[in-house]
Amino acid sequence: AGDGGTGTSSPITISSLTNGTAYTARVYAINAYGTSSASDASSSFTPSLPRAYFLGGTDGSNKTNAISYINMSTTGMDSIDFGDLAANQGNTTGCSSSTRGLVGSGLFWTGSTNSTVNTIQYITMTTSGSGQDFGDLTVARYEAGSFSNETRGVWFGGYAGGASNVIDYVTIASTGNASDFGNLLAANFSIQGTSGTTRGLMAGGYTNTRVNVIQYVTIASTADSTDFGDLSSVRSGVAGASSNTRALFANGFS
């Protein structure tokens, strides 16, 4: 229901709403003569705080199936349980639209054995729950990279008995197996990506040695990657972040 809000002019801020829940609002006036009748209900609105999600992972040889999140507009909070992946999964990578999160590739932990997987799972951002089956990547691998825009999720590179040069993609709003997008400049794993709405960048990684190459694709197309430039040093396992204007690559193994 929320705690409502007061004010002498528009807009009026309403507090204590639940993220992802639809609401309507009514307004009434209070003055020296009393309280008016409530207005008609407003159009439905759904508050949505920006969240960051964490899916699976590994600590040495121990894999986890945990999904958790934090609200990015707050500080000093621990992550909150969201649900579980289908199995303990590490060395995986994910991407998202504003409404869905996808996780694909990686290593499943089954007893004392790791198995490389091609599965893709998804969650609906505003509803806590476990990962649901989406489809399969074209190649089972781990230590792949990924990025997305609002429409497509893209995975590239990785390790599958050797480095892979495969780029494949899915339409995030649907479900189904990934389709071939093209190839990297060279087979590469421990590579990372980031993207704007139009371009996806892929940087660093390990071919037969660590590399400093940055390459790109146009996300709405299907084609092999194109050389973009170089990182300031050769390294694998970098972290990537971007806006629509600028991309940053940090850390990594040199």
Task: Name each model-derived stretch.
Residues 1-20, 32-33, 38:
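Recognizes extended acidic, P/S/T-rich segments that occur
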Residues 31-33, 43-254:
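Kelch-like beta-propeller repeat domains
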